Amino acid sequence: MREGTPRVRIEVNKGSNRPSQFVSESEEQRLQRVQSRDSDTATMNFVTDDRMMEEHDEYSAFKEAYEEEESREYVIENGVKRLVNQHYDSRGYSSAGRGQKGRREEERRRNMAVDYSSQDFRQSLAAIDQASRDGAISRGEDGVRVRQIGDTTIMTEHRDPYSFYWQLDQARREAESPPRRPPPTDYVIDEEEEVLETVYSPEADDVMFENQYRRPVRHPLPPPPPIMEEEPKDLPPGWEKHEDPQGYSYYWHVDSGTIQRQPPPPVNRETQADAPPPQIIQLPPQQPVIEEHAFKQTTTKRRIEQDEMSEREIEDVAMIENGDTYHKPVRFAVRSLGWTDISEDELTAEKSSRAVNRAIVDLTTRSDIDSIPKWGDGRELIMELDDNELALLDPDSMNVIHSERIQAIRVWGVGRDNGRDFAYVSRDRGTRRFMCHVFRCDTSAKTIANTLRDICKRLMLHRRPSSLHAIESGEKRIVRSEGLTAPIDEPRKVIRCHFLGVTQVPKATGIEILNEAVDRLVSQVRSERWILADVSIAPSTIAIVEVNGQQIAECRVRYLSFLGIGRDVKHCAFIMQTSSESFMCYVFHVEPNAAAMAKMVEAACKLRYQKVLDAHSSSRHHSGMSIHGQHPPSTYHGKGWTETFRDAFGSVTSRMVPSRSAQRL
């Protein structure tokens, strides 16, 4: 074997222990193939040749020393055995030589990567087996290389990292090992850069091909043309186009007061061509038309005569003349709340409204309402109204539980607190006392009240002479209707304005109180929150109705305590007394000034007062006038309250100039 050539020590374990053999590197591959086929486990320890030579030299020295010790003779003097030349111990070297050799042995062991002494053999073998089981591969730090080939574990030791085996292993690892993946990296994008896209035109000279890797560009579609509503060029007669403060257009019908966003349907041209040209009637100066930019306000007057019949009355008269007086009954779902008695003195024109409302409140707020007798024991009933009677029906069996003749009903009304409370007063057949019957309706009680009013109108028209022969005969027949009076529609004046709101005031009268309430609402309510409303003024009520909406409030003229104009001539307000200690102020903004509205409310108050005077004077002088055949005198120079109301409304426009003295009326 050549000097410098490494030798291999192979330990094979298969059922029995075999001694280690020293083989050359040329036989390593053959042994590996044999051990992989025949042995269960194999341990191969590679050591360098220089240490093997050193161990052989030490062994030869030990052997020579031992032989030399045995060949020498000893001299015994006085019982003491003494060497002749130099004393050696059993190992054949002196103490000084033993110290040098011991230090050399320790140095050798310190330089060795693996201790091959008997005391560390099992520990080294366990470490090698553990490394082979875990499949650990040395990285070169400890100078040990472990490989697993089949059932054989091979460990190579090298002291120099630049030795032949280390270089060979590195070259083989680079050729056989798969490429390592780069370590994971967290990419943090602080700000995304916008890539400016270059769109090449077909006419460009520098670009002759299309880049297939360029990002596709999606060209946005042009927006669709806006849908324009075709506005009619010529509006139908009576329609006008205006714009609100936000710039939106709306259409207003002057006669009916209808306001809508959609343009009105055009009138048929053929019909319009056949129709005669309209006559242009110039309005008198007492009825001016006030036009504004934000909205148009027109003061119109409805000519209502007491003897003038409406279209429904004309239809009813035609049906009566033809002999057709039958109307289908109308039914409502109601629930009886009971009844209470009312004295006959409270059924006058001045007290009946308060008496009926008090009866409704008493029956709806009583704590012992379960003990009060009710029709149908408080169950849901059907109220049927026809031209003859008012009947209460059982919804299950349709049997009549109670009925009243229409002529026997004295008064009817709707509750103030709840719009679904309906009541009527009639005389009881057994006790001959007046009873107020109260019902809770599923719908608005005004529908029942209006239906009952229409029935009474038809009954009055049926009793009225329907031909000119009866009128020309000169026979004046007085028809007594058993307490049933003809219902009359009150004349109303409608004015359009902005409603600011209602606020509570401490007193019922006073211009300072009114101005303070007006200033408070003007400062608290922004102009865009004002409600465009129609104020309907009649001698008995002032109704505030939102344009094309629901009713906001309804005030009784009899409870109006103060009326005035604010510091700004466009602000009008009045104070209503809701209870003995509660007063509410209603504030309005009128264009161009509030004088017209103030005069209308003033005229309604005067007519209300005149109506009360007429009622008292007629009751006081009724007996004397009936004897002498005279008519009752009137406070307003022989004019009725309808004519007085018409004259007052006609004179409103002549006093349109605002005045500061009109703040307190």
UniProtKB/Swiss-Prot annotation:
GO molecular function: amyloid-beta binding; molecular adaptor activity
Region (Disordered): 1-43, 90-111
Localization of this protein: Cytoplasm; Cytoplasm, Cytoskeleton
Feature: compositional bias, Basic and acidic residues: 1-12, 27-40, 102-111
Pfam families listed in its UniProt record: PID
Domain of life: Eukaryota
Expression across tissues: Expressed in the pharynx (including pharyngeal muscle and nerve cells), ventral nerve cord and tail neurons.
Post-translational modification: Phosphorylated.
Keywords: Cytoplasm, Cytoskeleton, Repeat, Transcription, Transcription regulation
GO biological process: embryo development ending in birth or egg hatching; feeding behavior; nematode larval development; regulation of DNA-templated transcription
Domain PID, chain residue ranges per copy: 330-456, 499-615
Quaternary context: Interacts (via PID 2 domain) with apl-1 (via cytoplasmic domain).
Function: Modulates pharyngeal pumping activity, at least in part by regulating expression of the acetylcholinesterase genes ace-1 and ace-2.
Protein name: Protein Fe65 homolog
